[in-house]
Each structure stands twice: as structure tokens, then as C-alpha cells.
Amino acid sequence: MPLPEKALIARIARQAWTAAPAAGARGRDTYQKAHTRTGVAGLRRGIGDDCAVLQLPSGHAALVTTDFSLEEVHFRRRWHPPESVGHRCLARGLSDIAAMGGKPLAAFVSLALPAGLPQEWVDGFFKGFLGLAKRFSVVLAGGDTSQSPGGVLADIILLGSAPAGTAVLRSGARAGDSLYVTGELGAAAQVLAQLRSGRLKRPSPRRYPAHFLPIPRIAAGHILRARRLASAMIDISDGLSTDLRHLCEESGVGARIYAEKVPAAGGAAKLRFALHGGDDYELLFTAKGKVPDSIAGVSVTRIGEVTRGRKIVLVEDGQERELPAGGWEHFGRRPR
């Protein structure tokens, strides 16, 4: 079972290169100085006080996102190793920050854990979480713990920033803009389908990174914002068909996409996974001008254009049909 709460927090703090309150100010000072040296957001006070105290970069606005992950809905322990669960929990928030062109700064983790959960599982969760956090210079600044009467529950709040007035919103698309996506779509959903069918048992996360260890497009999002290339942007977490509709609704526009242009992992035969699968954590964005074929080492593909009105259509084999939002829906659809 997990350690008692105080000991658990101390263990998490040590994993995050900080110290529990019992270690005194010296450990916390070392932590703060280390992050000052590496240029991470100005953490003035982290784990050990009632609130974290952070200083935003001068002239920046705060970006705040929260994501809730529930066992048997967003992950299953029999399928997902704890390192993958921790990684994926943070990746969801990082992808939101990427979609606004921001820089991630600090994370807060609230965990509810069942009494019978091995401490080794908790250690693995934070190994995955903190490994991804380190990659993007994100500091674990606080959180909460509780006992769960059922499965594992993880709530992640992520703080980021962008120069004031520059964050890329969903509402900036205009008729005539081109539609682009980064990377490939549908690989994560294909792995999930194999897990559900039983064809894939105890897979290696390193062999199927799109599903188990996705990497959010932080650098690409930053460049799209900084160079003013994107007029509107959203991350693809619920599926292209659904997230495209979210963007169009916020902008008050429609869209036309071309099936043969969608970069579906596995080719045209896997198009349905690319359109409706979700968990891609790629970026969907609109642009008024031409965009490079690659940004920050990630491929960029033009898949269509923004149109007047509110209709969203797919052109396939020369035929145009309305594209329904067939991706993830929290109420009324089966768990992932």
C-alpha cells in the first residue's frame, strides 16, 4: 500500500529534487537555486507551504490548464505501466500549453490512491511524470494526496506563460485560411484498439510511444506563435474530427479537409483512426500564409481550408460529405 501521507509527500518531494518540510529550508533553498541556474520559472516557494509562490517572467501572461485522469476511463493498470500513466497525465496539460504557443513552467499534482496500491506503482508514476517534466523544464510545485475508495485518480494543473497578448487562441481562424496538422495522426488510437481486442498483451511502451509516451509539440507551438504563423490553434486530443469542430465553433467558421491529405499513420486504410481516434497530442492550426513543411523537426501537412458558414466537410474519392464529430466524448461513449 502507499506510504502514510507525510512520508509519501516527503518521498515525492525527494523524487522532484526538493525536500520535505522536515528537511528544513536548506533542502528547499538548494532546490530553488538549482532551478534558478537552469532558468526554470521563478519558484519562490514550492512543496512544504500552503501555497506555491511563483514569479512569472516579466511581461508574460499566465496560461493555466487542468486535466483529470481516472483509472478505467483514461488508463488501465493492466495495460499501462505506471511510468506511462505519469507521463501521459503530464503530456495532456503540456499539449494544451503547446496549443497556445506557451512555455510550461510548473505543475501541481493531486492524487487519490486506493489503499491496496503498491508504493512501487506510485514511484513509477512519478518517474514517468518527472522524466517528462525534466525534458520541458517543468517544476513540480505542489499538489495533494488522498485515499481513493476505488481506482487511481490524478488531477494535474499546469501553469505556463506567453508574452502578454500573444497566446494563440481557437477563435482566430478566418475563411480562406489554410488548415494544417503536425506529425501523424491515429497511431495512438490503433494501439488502443489492439489493447481492447486482446491482440496486444503487455506491450513495451518504448515500442509504441505514440500511445504510451506521447511527446507534446511544445517547440512547434512556440515557433508558430513567435513567428505569427498560426491564426488559430488547438491540440488534437479528442480526435481530428472533434477538435476541428471545437476550433471552428470558437472561430464561427466552417472547414473542408481532404482525406488524401490527412497524414494517417499506416496510410489511407487507417483514416478512421486519424479522423476520430484521439490521443494524438499533435497541433491543428490555421494560417493565412504558407507554412514550412517542417517546424522544430516535426512534419507539417496542409489538410484543407477554412470556409464560410459552419459546415465541416470531408472530401474523399471526389465526393464531399459532412464530417461528424466522431472523436472522444466524455458522456455517452465507452472509456478509452
Task: Locate each region found by the language model.
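Glycine-rich phosphate/pyrophosphate-binding loop regions near the starts of catalytic domains
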Residues: A10-P21, Y31, R37-V181
